[in-house]
Amino acid sequence: LKCLTPSLWVAQSRLYFSNSGVFLSEGRACLVDPGVFPEEIEALARFLEERGAPPEVIVLTHSHWDHLLGPERFPGVKIIAQANYLAAISGRAADEIPWQIEEWAAEHGIDRPQPFSLPEPDETFGEMLELAVGELALRLVHAPGHAVDQAVVYEPESATLWAADMLSDLEIPFVSHSLSAYEETLAMLSAWEVRVLIPGHGQPTASKREIRSRLEEDRAYLAELRARVLQAVREGLTVGEAVRLCADMPYRHPQENIGPHRLNVESAYLELGGEADATKVGWNRL
């Protein structure tokens, strides 16, 4: 694990460069999205055992499958999630998330001793929750856009932002919930003092310039996405034509992100009033 602040350690998975966090203070620990592979979760458990600090709380930043594998290793530990989490794991997702995990486990030759059960939160919150961890005062803040139940974790003393699945150096914004909500979330975060940034996927940074750059680039991407897709809708273009209209938009790592960009365009097309089969286009079709 890498120590980023006197109270925060981060471990990075080999899957999607996923980050897991440990906030530690006065012998008390809070885990954030512990994962992903069994041996990586075990390493987190050993880290805490060596420090005599069993976890008291697990924060799940949102309900996507790659963020949900840790709690089963820590039975009895309090789980906190945003209030929309319960709806997000119900319905179709109640079957899809375990299926995604089974597919991932089979692909990587992981022998799971028991079927996956969706983590059930012991506490949920609406827009904000203050969480004490030793002497730390963490703020859990609703930050939708990527997911309806997404939340960030902010530690004001060190101005540390755990940004969930946003502000990556590798990924563009994955607008799998709502373009409007994502824009509002980034506007909110832009007003905060942030000296240490940890994305859900990718490299953490303590560079003021890098933090500002990621915020500005992602906000600019969303603004251009909105403008171009709105133009397509107003001109009566099809969703395929909207995708072509947005094909030359600039964004980071285009070779890796061309698929997510297309899904963003399709989902924005539906959100902004375009007519298409929502089961066949956008993030909902995955």
Annotate each language-model stretch with its function.
Residues 231-286:
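C-terminal regulatory/interaction regions
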Residues 41-42, 46-126, 130:
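Active-site HxH/HxHxD metal-binding segment of metal-dependent hydrolases
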Residues 151-166, 181, 185-194:
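Metal-dependent phosphodiesterase/nuclease catalytic metal-binding core
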Residues 32-35, 56-64, 80-83, 142-144, ...:
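Active-site neighborhood of phospho(di)ester-bond hydrolases with catalytic His/Asp-centered motifs
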Residues 37-39, 63-69, 86-89, 147-150, ...:
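Active-site environment of divalent metal-dependent phosphoester hydrolases
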Residues 1-46, 50, 152-165:
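Conserved beta-strand hairpin/beta-sheet module of binuclear metal-dependent hydrolase folds
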Residues 74, 181-241, 245:
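Divalent-metal (often Zn2+) His-rich catalytic cores of metallo-beta-lactamase-fold enzymes
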Residues 126-155:
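Core dinuclear metal-dependent hydrolase active-site scaffold
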